[in-house]
Amino acid sequence: MFWLIKKEFLYNFRYKMRTLNLFFNPFFMIAPYVLLAENYQAGSRILGSMILWSWLVQLIYGISYGIESLKIEGVLGIILMSPIHFIGYQFAYYIYLIFHQLLVTGITLILTYIFLGVTVDNTLMFFGTLIISSVGLFCFTVGYSSFVLKYKKMQGINTTLQNVFGFLSGYTIPVKKFPVVLRFASYLIPLTYAIYAMDIEYAVSPIYICMFALISLVWLVVGVIFVNKNLNSMKKRGDFEQW
């Protein structure tokens, strides 16, 4: 597992232009929205919520949508024949992404402060929220990956779904302003709880923490069950590659 983490770091730092793109791209993507929100005294809130959302996006690309890349590259079959379970492989990649995203987030916050004069409130608590919420986001992406394994057409709507998840989680508009039906859907996404915690300055009640833990656990259980089921079906069909 630790070899997999080391491999990802070595791969990224071997290709320096790719590394620079990964490190600095989030700032240029987030900056226009932060500048616009700053006109309404909401720059700090939008900055924090979009960084939280970017963590979900990276986890989806690395853990869920990344399955498509593994199939195209012919690597998925090798992973399934290795001693490590596929969920273990996903967990190893999740650990790598935590360190990667912490570094990217730090660079993004420094750049937004230098060039935009905007930063998040209570930086220490914000980083703590990022790390804790990433556990729920990992559970969510494991569940999401079961759909990627089952339905090939997920590849075509992946980017759209990422934006839907971000919107429902309240990365632009607080969830409490949504209609009841949308609010119900929002609370099925672990990211919602992280953004809400930031909105209320991290004064989260135990009930809210329990809801976050329960939703995350449900996604993990559903993901593990259906990932194993779909992988067994792929093994029977020999469908490990995609051309």
Where are these regions (language model features)?
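Hydrophobic transmembrane alpha-helices and immediately adjacent juxtamembrane helices
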Residues: 1-131, 135-243
